[in-house]
């Protein structure tokens, strides 16, 4: 069967035809580690981890790039407000994102580039845009000329988001020599006290959109298969990525996939609304594998409305699968059902795929009740194949001293690192930093216990 993907760019289901037969190239907009990850962030990681696993299951060699935006305005602002170096701030939260990905069984990317490590590629990209007449330098900053590009032959600016050029606002100040209000920064001139890198146009730091265009094409080539990300990135970020790439002469991504939001009481989960749920807090209620099951259970293009009852129902659903496999005993991974394959090939329709799994579980339990262990074992093998594709095969999760043990080990590594930073601060009599570490851990439901032998921790 042929995988069909809903391409945001054309708003249609399209047959997936990779640029290079037998291979798939995928770029996912990853974390901006300005603060702790919440389940809104993690839903995107789980959704496209499932996509990646399905591509692999279909026999494709997958190059999966997930970037880290390790420099931007919010990072600098928050680091400054808390009296910490920007790079230390980033490192702290990047570790939290990595722990979260690992705890929920998200496969490590083939490459995880950081923006600050690719300034050379960004300079080359800006030079191409300037040479092509679609970018200009002003007082150390470099801007993309939206008007020039939108009038150029072959321009498709606005097609991804459906916005008209005259209605677009980039959020960039208009008083820094921009030619037009829609123009956006490729490079931001250095400001006192901020990190900067040298370029032919002056010292400064990267613009958000430039980072991804430069890194995606550097690792995956000027034309690659799939670009993924959250729906909120569609404009301006992804729209501007496309503009930069096409204006530079790159074909860029053939397919665009966007996951919808996690909402609570009908509102998008966001830090500004104060309705975010941190992963450690949620792991007090369910195991990591059950949280993964929940986050992946809705279609990636559908809103995932959070409630405690929905989370509990998901955990019960997973335990039903787990219980069946425990009843059967040891079985090898078999083959998925035709219905499962059809569901996954139709734009990664996980709800339909889960229905196939639960049908097999019901039939398997019925077979066991009748004493037909061979039929039950065959169904269990199929269940393992299907749950493996979705990243929650109970046997695999159970093989590492249980999912709880896996989470505890990862959590201990993360918190121990923070306790070491606190111990250093206390030794230097930097009580502000020491208290900040303690308070931030407390906000995540972790109590620091000081003993004669040093600090330890426990869940509140």
From Swiss-Prot:
Keywords on record: Aminoacyl-tRNA synthetase, ATP-binding, Cytoplasm, Ligase, Metal-binding, Nucleotide-binding, Protein biosynthesis, Zinc
CDD domains: CysRS_core (cd00672)
InterPro entries, alphabetized: Cys-tRNA-ligase, Cys-tRNA-synt_Ia_DALR, Cys-tRNA/MSH_ligase, Rossmann-like_a/b/a_fold, tRNA-synt_1_cat_dom, tRNAsynth_Ia_anticodon-bd
Enzyme class (EC, first level): ligase
Short motif 'HIGH' region, span: 31-41
Motif 'KMSKS' region in this chain: 268-272
Record GO biological process: cysteinyl-tRNA aminoacylation
GO cellular component: cytosol
Reaction catalysed by this enzyme: tRNA(Cys) + L-cysteine + ATP = L-cysteinyl-tRNA(Cys) + AMP + diphosphate
EC number: 6.1.1.16
Main localization category: cytoplasm
Subcellular location(s) of the protein: Cytoplasm
Binding residues annotated for ATP, in chain numbering: 271
Cofactor note: Binds 1 zinc ion per subunit.
Gene3D superfamilies: Cysteine-tRNA ligase, C-terminal anti-codon recognition domain, HUPs
SUPFAM superfamilies xrefs: Anticodon-binding domain of a subclass of class I aminoacyl-tRNA synthetases, Nucleotidylyl transferase
Single GO molecular function: ATP binding
Cofactors (names): Zn(2+)
Positions bound to Zn(2+): 29, 212, 237, 241
Pfam family of the protein (one): tRNA-synt_1e
Subunit comment: Monomer.
Family indicated by similarity: Belongs to the class-I aminoacyl-tRNA synthetase family.
The protein's name: Cysteine--tRNA ligase
Source organism of this protein record: Corynebacterium glutamicum (strain R)
Upper classification of the organism: Bacteria, Bacillati, Actinomycetota, Actinomycetes, Mycobacteriales
């Amino acid at each position: 069967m042929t995988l069909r993907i809903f391409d945001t760019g054309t708003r249609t289901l399209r047959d997936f035809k990779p640029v290079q037969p037998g291979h798939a190239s995928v770029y996912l907009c990853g974390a901006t580690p300005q603060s702790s990850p919440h389940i809104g962030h993690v839903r995107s990681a789980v959704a496209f981890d499932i996509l990646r696993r399905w591509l692999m299951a279909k026999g494709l060699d997958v190059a999966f790039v997930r970037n880290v935006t390790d420099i931007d305005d919010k990072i600098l602002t928050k680091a400054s407000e808390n009296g910490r170096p920007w790079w230390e701030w980033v490192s702290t939260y990047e570790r939290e994102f990595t722990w979260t990905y690992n705890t929920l069984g998200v496969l490590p990317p083939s490459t995880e580039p950081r923006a600050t490590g690719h300034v050379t590629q960004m300079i080359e990209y800006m030079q191409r845009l300037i040479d092509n007449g679609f970018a200009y330098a002003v007082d150390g900053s470099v801007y993309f000329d939206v008007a020039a590009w939108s009038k150029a032959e072959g321009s498709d600016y606005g097609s991804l988001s459906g916005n008209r050029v005259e209605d677009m606002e980039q959020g960039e100040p208009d008083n820094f020599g921009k030619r037009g209000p829609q123009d956006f920064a490729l490079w931001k001139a250095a400001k006192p006290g901020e990190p900067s890198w040298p370029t032919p146009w002056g010292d400064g730091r990267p613009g958000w959109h430039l980072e991804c265009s430069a890194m995606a094409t550097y690792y995956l080539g000027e034309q690659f298969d799939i670009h993924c990300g959250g729906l909120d990135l569609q404009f301006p970020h992804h729209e501007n990525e496309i503009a930069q790439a096409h204006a530079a002469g790159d074909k860029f991504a053939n397919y665009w996939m966007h996951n919808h939001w996690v909402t609570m009481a009908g509102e998008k989960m966001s830090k500004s609304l104060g309705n975010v749920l941190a992963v450690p807090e949620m792991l007090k209620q369910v195991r990591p594998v059950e949280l993964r099951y929940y986050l992946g259970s809705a279609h990636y293009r559908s809103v995932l409305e959070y409630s405690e009852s929905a989370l509990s129902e998901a955990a019960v659903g997973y335990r039903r699968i787990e219980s069946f496999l425990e009843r059967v005993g040891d079985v090898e991974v078999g083959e998925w059902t035709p219905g499962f394959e059809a569901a996954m090939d139709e734009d990664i329709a996980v709800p339909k795929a889960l229905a196939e799994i639960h049908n097999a579980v019901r039939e398997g339990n019925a077979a066991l009740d009748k004493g037909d262990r061979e039929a039950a074992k065959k169904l269990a093998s199929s269940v393992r194949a299907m749950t493996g594709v979705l990243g929650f095969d109970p046997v695999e999760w159970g093989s590492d001293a249980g999912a709880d043990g896996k989470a505890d080990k990862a959590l201990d590594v993360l918190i121990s690192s923070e306790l070491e930073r606190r111990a250093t601060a206390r030794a230097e009599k930097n009580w502000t930093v020491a208290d900040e570490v303690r308070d931030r851990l407390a906000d995540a439901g972790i109590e620091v216990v000081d003993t004669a032998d040093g600090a330890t921790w426990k869940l509140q």
